[in-house]
Amino acid sequence: MKVKLISALNDTNVDAAQVSNQRQLSISMSAIPVGFEQTLPLNLCLILDQSGSMSGEPMNTVMQAVEQLLDQLKPGDRISVIAFAGTARVIIPNQIVSDRNSIKTQLKVKRKAAGGTVIAEGLSLGITELLKGTKGAVSQAFLLTDGHGDKGLQIWKWQIGPNDNKRCLQLAKKAAKLNLTINTLGFGDDWNQNLLEKIADAGGGTLAYIENPEQAVTQFARLFRRVQLVGLTNAHLLLSFVPGVRLAELKPIAQVAPDTIELPVETDANGTLVLRLGDLMKDVERVVLANIYLGQLPEGKQVIGHLQIRYDDPSLNKQGLLSPLAPIYANFTKSYEPALNSQVLQSILLLAKYRQTQLAEAKLALGDAKGAATMLQTAANTALQIGDSSAVTVLQSSATRLQVGKELSKSDQKKTRIASKTVLKE
C-alpha cells in the first residue's frame, strides 16, 4: 500500500502587496493498492450493551446484525465480544474465526439482560481483547449502547464513585495510542450523543445512530464496509510551514470527510505539527482543512510548507513508514485575481455546517431557542449548497420546530448531530 496525498488552497493566487493573507488549505489522503493486494485481516471486538432496556426486540435485532457480520468475516479474521450492563464480561474471547456456528451459539447462550450501564468497563475489556490480535491486522471495536454511562455523584469538589463518562474518554484516547479504532453506535433515543461522539472522535472512529431496531443490521453493515476498506493504519499528518506562514490560533484544523471532527494539534521536537488521523481507507479520502495565514513572500510560485504522512502498513507488519515529502505551493502576484478551487469550497462548507450546528446546540442549551433556530436554518442552507439533501431535510425540520415554539425531541437532537457530522448519502 502507498499513500495518496494531495493539497490545495481555496485560492491559489495570493496578493503579494498584502502584509497578510488568509487561506484554507485542504489536504486529502487515502491508501492506494500497489498491484493486487488482498483485504487486510480484521481484528474486531463488539462491545454490546445488555442492560435491561436492550431486552426483547432491541437485543434480538442487534444479535441478527452481529450474526450477519460474523458471516462476512474471512478465514484469518479475529472476533471478540464483550457484554456490559451493571458489570462487563467477556462473552467471546479474542479468537480466529473458524467455527461461526459455535460462536453464534455461545452468543445466544451467554447473553442476558441486567441493570446498569458501565460503558467504560466494557470498553476497557474490549481494548484488552483487541490487543491479543493486533499483529498484521486492522483492529477496531464497535461499541453499542442505548444509555448513559454512570457519572457517580459529585458533591462540590469531590467525586463519589467512578465517573464512567470521563473514563470512557480516557480509554478512547488510550486505544488510539495503541492503534485501535473505536466506533460508536447509539441505539434508540436515550443515549448520550455528546459522550459517544467524543469517544468516536478520540478513538479515530465514526458515530452511528440506530433510531429503530430494524436499522441495526444496516448500521452494522455500513461500519463493517468501512473497516473492510482500511489499507493503512495509525496515520499521522506531519505539517510544516516556511517562516511567515502559520496556523490560525482558534480551531485551526478539522477533518471534514468522511466525518467532521475537530482535530487536536501537537508539535514535535523539530517544530513540525502532528495530527493523528487513524486509518486510511482505499478509494475513500480522508480530508483535513487547515486555516492558515500567509505573510509577504516574493512574487511567483512559492513553497509555503511541506506535508508528509507517517503510517503503519499491517500487510508488511511495518510501523512508522513515511510517505514522500510533498511541497505546498502558492502563487504570489501583485496583479492579484482570485483562482478559486471549488473542491476546497465544498470542504469549507462541510466544516461550516458542523460548526453552525454546534453553535445552535450551544444556544439551545442556554435556552435561546430563537437563536438556535436561526443557526439551524443557516446550517440547512449550507447543506443545500453542498448538495446534501438529507441533511437539509433534518436541519430544516429541527429549525422549523424551534421556530414554531416546539421542543426538539431526543430523536431530533440525535438526527441533527449526525446530519452535522456527515454527508447523509450512505
Predicted feature descriptions by range:
Residues L294-E426:
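Long, acidic serine/threonine- and proline-rich intrinsically disordered regions
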Residues K2-N234, P298:
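Exposed acidic/Ser/Thr-rich ligand/metal-binding surfaces
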Residues A8-N13, A221, T272-L277, N291-I292:
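Short structured motifs
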Residues D279-G300:
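Low-complexity, intrinsically disordered segments enriched in Ser/Thr together with acidic residues
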Residues P258-V284:
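Extracellular adhesion/glycan-binding regions together with long Ser/Thr-
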Residues S26-S28, A290-I292, L307-I309:
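OB-fold and OB-like beta-barrel modules that bind single-stranded nucleic acids
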Residues I91-P93, V287, K301-H306:
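Local beta-strand/beta-hairpin segments that build beta-sheet-rich folds
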